[in-house]
């Protein structure tokens, strides 16, 4: 059974990266005898995210992501991060004026989203999907993968949907293209039209262009970015990956961010 109701709230302080104002919501369920059955506490924020003429806006003002891809990884403990390590990560990001994180390439620990709510970090929440090396085969248009993909999408959405920090749902990473991504896109938009859907794989097959509300690319040159924006102003452009710290790389970052477009 599902039920919906609305409670008007006046004179709220809006949530943003600069001013991450939060409120405590308490939901109490009573039985017919007025006995408490369940109490839920939720940390919530009020904000309006919109896309206007290809420009992302939060609370009516243009926003630009200065972001990173973040893996849940520690050199000593592997993928088992402590809460203290997550807090350390968030403090490092804020000290570097980073305002956005893509949860590459899977949903993160639930505590991470609470920190992003509290400290004002925009989140691209990414599904646990990557078929690197086999993305020309899996999942593509194959119906045998659809239920599995939708199960992962639902799990992420239902767990994370109330976080004000999440501005986009991401369909995964380097998993090719195909009709399954249109199905995933439509699922998220049906559940949550207030957020955008992100997927870089549309650049591999323009047949499914509408699977992403964002023109997302990897390692494009600044010249290519400018050329796209001049020719295709409808979608916002995002470099979901543009620097990689393998070996002796990770230089020349300034040319990607010094000239806003």
Regions found by a protein language model. Give the residues of each.
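Substrate-binding/catalytic cleft of secreted carbohydrate-active enzymes
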Residues: 90-93, 100-258
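Secreted/periplasmic carbohydrate-active enzymes, especially glycoside hydrolases
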Residues: 1-123, 151-152, 162-168, 184, ...
